[in-house]
């Protein structure tokens, strides 16, 4: 029997889930924290991830200890400390700064379809990772990543393109990530055995 379900996400022990939505066949690794985030179909994260204010496409592969939507502290005020906006934790007569949390929640990170985010990578708010892109382990990503590219480092920069531009564009046009579950199963042998170019020749 298949481990994953179209109806219910597979959420492992010790996770903290806050106001998040999950598509079909989603898996959340043990001890992960997911807040104000949408996970597309077939996407997963491994253990110990911290994901906030993110929009994650389909078939995203997120390794352990990844942080997406890492939150900021105020840089222009007299103090950086979160007593400025988590004030109710420090004084009985002070309220938290709701406007700060609203502004922070609006700064989404976007992760495209069929992406791979390597172990321990950090992706800042308002960054878009294009379809088919790879973020190397330990990278700090502060700028958008083009589709079907591989980036790495602190701060992340281009390592190489996965495919020639024409192939990358054709893969995006094919949008196989929108195929239904039955079709994906029928095409599984070709996903396993064909190069991207041969796959496009057969299905594009």
State what each model feature region is.
Residues 116, 134, 150-151:
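Short-chain dehydrogenase/reductase
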Residues 12, 81-123, 155-204:
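C-terminal segments of enzyme domains that contribute to small-molecule binding surfaces
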Residues 4-13, 18-127:
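Flexible, glycine/small-residue-enriched loop-and-beta-strand segment within the central core
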Residues 63, 136, 152:
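Alpha/beta-hydrolase-fold catalytic nucleophile elbow
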Residues 72-74, 145, 161-163:
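Conserved catalytic-core motifs of eukaryotic protein kinase domains, centered on the activation segment
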Residues 119, 137, 147:
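Catalytic-loop Lys-Pro-X-Asn motif of eukaryotic-like protein kinases
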């Amino acid at each position: 029997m298949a481990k994953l379900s179209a109806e219910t996400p597979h959420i492992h022990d010790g996770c903290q889930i806050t106001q998040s939505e999950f598509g079909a066949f989603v898996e959340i690794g043990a001890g992960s924290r997911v807040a104000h985030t949408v996970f597309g179909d077939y996407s997963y994260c491994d253990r110990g991830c911290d994901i906030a204010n993110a929009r994650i496409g389909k078939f995203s592969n997120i390794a352990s200890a990844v942080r997406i939507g890492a939150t900021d502290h105020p840089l222009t005020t007299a103090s950086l400390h979160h007593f400025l906006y988590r004030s109710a934790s420090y004084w009985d007569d002070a309220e938290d700064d709701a406007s700060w949390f609203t502004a922070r929640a609006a700064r989404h990170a976007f992760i495209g379809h069929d992406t791979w985010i390597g172990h321990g990578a950090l992706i800042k708010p308002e960054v878009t990772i294009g379809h088919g892109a790879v973020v190397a382990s330990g990278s700090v990503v502060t700028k958008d990543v083009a589709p079907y590219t591989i980036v790495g480092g602190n701060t992340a920069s281009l390592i190489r393109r996965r495919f020639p531009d024409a192939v990358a564009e054709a893969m995006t046009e094919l949008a196989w990530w929108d195929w239904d579950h039955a079709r994906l199963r029928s095409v599984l042998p070709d996903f396993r055995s064909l190069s991207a170019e041969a796959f496009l020749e057969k299905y594009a």
